[in-house]
Amino acid sequence: MEMVINLLLFYSKILVVLLLFQQISNQPIKPLWYIITPFLYVLLLIICPPVGYFAYFFIFIAYNIYRNRYKSKILNIFYGLYPIIVDSLLGRMLGFYVFPLLGVYVFNEASLSWYDILIELLVFPFHLLIVKSLRLDFNEIKEGFK
């Protein structure tokens, strides 16, 4: 059962990062990649865990540099790291601050649970709520890097 929870957590984490990446970069991702990417990432983690761990941070930067060869490199780094950092920060904020305020506590942080998957699935809607309430426009960032 723990392996199923672990695989679902990986899938939900990569799904959320892909959705965040698509939202801020305005680069459409084909629906097939939402299925293939988590599978390939889990396969990479099984074959060589250190490479899989570091590939998680560099894959979006490399993808942006490939897609936008003649654009700003700093903007490519921003688009590559933003989804990963926001996923981590909002997940921690939900898990350690928001849910305990609502009376939901994690008693054993060392083991994975359905609670972790719920946190991952709530990161993207929470991000959308923050972006819409603050009226952030990521297209203005492109103009700042010109």
Regions found by a protein language model. Name each.
Residues 2-146:
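Hydrophobic alpha-helices of bacterial signal-transduction systems
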